[in-house]
Amino acid sequence: MKIDVDYAIAQYAQGLFLMADDRHGLGWYSSDRHALIPLDDQFRYPKSLQRVLNQNRFQVKINQAFTAVCEGCAARPETWISQELIEVYHTFHVAGWAHSFETWHGDRLAGGILGIAIRGAFIGESMFYTIPEASKVAMVKLVQHLRQRSYQLFDAQLQNPHLKRFGAYEVEEKAYKKQLEKALNYRCHFTSEPDLYD
């Protein structure tokens, strides 16, 4: 799929997101409710995870294995991430929008989170792991990273029991768009590279 990156990022900035399905290829979707990961003191995680964090079992890297993270996120029996969508994410990545936040165990990619960063908003697209606890560690470290860089919004899109363990909560579309609009007023850089959305 050939995609206009500027148009696509503008769609994300309006609260839409891309998904693949078997019948129609890629399409733009919206949701009545969005799951948000809190970036304040409402963020939490299981006590058992603190032991893993204290052990420093995993190392964190950013954008070192972007394609592998996309493929890891897509490697499940039911997935909305097609090969076509992976190629689109790669286009976003080359343009500076899409990022992979990774956990490594030695020289092995253990897990990661795929997302799109637009100014003060981080839109989490998917996550995966190959070693237990790796994606949970990635979540904790990503929240720390977003806080350090003054991000205002972490959109995890769809609520699930796993996200609830981190304090994820749902907001309706109208409230979400207000928070998104506010976040887009902040100039945040996910990496040391300047944000392109001006």
Curated annotation (Swiss-Prot):
EC primary class: transferase
Keywords tagged on the record: Acyltransferase, Cytoplasm, Transferase
EC numbers: 2.3.2.6
Top-level taxon in the UniProt lineage: Bacteria
Subcellular location: Cytoplasm
InterPro entries: Acyl_CoA_acyltransferase (IPR016181), Leu/Phe-tRNA_Trfase (IPR004616), Leu/Phe-tRNA_Trfase_C (IPR042203)
One Pfam assignment: Leu_Phe_trans
Protein name: Leucyl/phenylalanyl-tRNA--protein transferase
Species for this entry: Synechocystis sp. (strain ATCC 27184 / PCC 6803 / Kazusa)
Gene: aat
